[in-house]
């Protein structure tokens, strides 16, 4: 295992242990994070997002990760998050593909990809099934996620 594979492993092990501080230590101060739920987050927003998600999960979040691969500049991993979605209390099993870029021994860019329609069907039931594939619905979810993060950052 090289140092960047060890860094990815450290990140997801901390995530599985609900350790937001250690997760944050894996990121470069100028980190960019992108995913379908939040869109683009930068710098301290990224660590605050993970902290918020861990607090909202109230210990009911299961993280599994696999296929950790990295070289000197890029890396990837697959991970699965199992939790109850806070707005509906519906069980979600989200399968995510992550890509990383490294700088100065830390993660400078983190991109998570997942099937938004599949996620929305689990999180919202029939509404997600009918509307989850639409750009309108996806933008609404993203807007609500960003609003929750902004409120959390004020605390």
Task: Label each region the model flagged.
Residues 8-11, 23-24, 31, 46, ...:
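Hydrophobic pocket/interface hotspot
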Residues 54-64, 69-155:
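A beta-strand edge to alpha-helix "cap/lid" segment located at domain peripheries
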Residues 7, 45-46, 116, 137:
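Alpha-helical structural motif
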Residues 1-17, 21, 25, 29, ...:
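Short, low-complexity N-terminal intrinsically disordered segments enriched in polar/charged residues
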Residues 3, 45, 92:
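Soluble or luminal CAZymes and related metallo-dependent hydrolases
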Residues 21-22, 29-75:
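A solvent-exposed, acidic/Ser-Thr-rich amphipathic alpha-helical stretch
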Residues 11-15, 27, 33, 38, ...:
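Aromatic side chains
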């Amino acid at each position: 295992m090289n140092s960047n594979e060890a860094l990815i492993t450290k990140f997801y092990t901390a995530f599985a242990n609900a350790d937001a501080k250690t997760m944050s230590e894996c990121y470069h101060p100028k980190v960019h994070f992108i995913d379908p739920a939040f869109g683009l987050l930068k710098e301290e927003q990224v660590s605050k997002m993970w902290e918020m998600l861990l607090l909202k999960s109230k210990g009911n979040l299961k993280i599994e990760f696999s296929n950790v691969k990295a070289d000197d500049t890029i890396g990837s991993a697959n991970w699965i998050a199992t939790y109850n979605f806070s707005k509906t209390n519906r069980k979600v099993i989200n399968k995510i593909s992550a890509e990383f870029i490294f700088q100065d021994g830390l993660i400078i860019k983190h991109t998570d990809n997942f099937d938004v329609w599949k996620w929305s069907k689990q999180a919202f039931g029939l509404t997600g099934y009918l509307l989850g594939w639409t750009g309108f619905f996806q933008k609404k979810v993203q807007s609500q996620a960003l609003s929750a993060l902004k409120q959390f950052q004020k605390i």
